[in-house]
């Protein structure tokens, strides 16, 4: 690898019709204190001016690399980005989100301190407004106080690394000690304490390219592809470092995902967890109960979305109801799964598996 590319971070950003927000996202990358990066913007032939904006920004900054492609989904775009990336490290960013200025510096420092394969930071839920940041429980945060606390989290990592400055060129191999506020997980801990605890996002992560190798996103999944990418990586990594520092702003829909109507693509959530069940049961058998309980919950969530549809429309999805029923049955039948279910789901799964039509009718009446 050329010395110029040594230590470079390749940021992969798929986009389609994102003119309203991609400028803010790209600007947050240009404001990074770590300057050794390239940004691959994979544009699925946008029709709203996104393409023109990205090319204009690329003229201003040669690190921005627009790539026009056929519209065939986020996973295919990320895979193309992986093929074309020149960096030693990889990061995925969604075009409607943004980064804290210290994010790349902090994650790079963590890889150097811990010699781990992945470095992960926490994130804010963000409504797109200057002061609209939320914690995990969706409570609005006091922006100024939180900004100071988060800067302190970043400073602990950078001071420990000795790189509290802009534009670090490469990960230093000299330390293998995590900074305060950074925890290093081995592979089993990463599965049990992180992936299977709701942390299945592929963004807010800095990956060593060598750890990814030939692993790619599954293009047959429209939901759950992030989780399966991380699951597929498991056998190629040794450790993961995770910090409390929040470096990523994840744009939220203030109406809430649960209010979105059912779409057939939601069934991919079940498919992805069925794949995960097979992998976890084989490689991490102690987590069998946990992963199968998640499969059951994913079946219940999809069934709940179908239940909220008007009666005539709901009848169109009888095949999907059967698939949900099968997933829930399979999930709760696994050893240890019932004990892992959230309490509210223990009664729900019992009713749904016993009489699906009654459950759907009751759920429809309750929610509507």
Where are the model-predicted features located?
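Short, acidic, metal-binding catalytic loop of nucleotide-sugar glycosyltransferases
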Residues: 27-36
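Donor-binding/catalytic cores of nucleotide-activated saccharide
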Residues: 95-241, 248-266
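Short aromatic/hydrophobic "clamp" motif used to bind/position activated sugar donors
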Residues: 90
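Membrane-interface aromatic/basic loop that binds lipid-linked glycans or pyrophosphate carriers
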Residues: 153-156, 162-165, 169-172, 308-368
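Glycine-rich, basic loop-to-helix element that forms the pyrophosphate-binding segment
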Residues: 69-85
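A conserved acidic beta->alpha catalytic loop
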Residues: 35, 43-52, 94
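N-proximal low-complexity "stem/linker" segments adjacent to membrane-targeting elements
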Residues: 1-28
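Catalytic core of nucleotide-sugar-dependent glycosyltransferases
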Residues: 238, 246-253, 259-287, 298-332
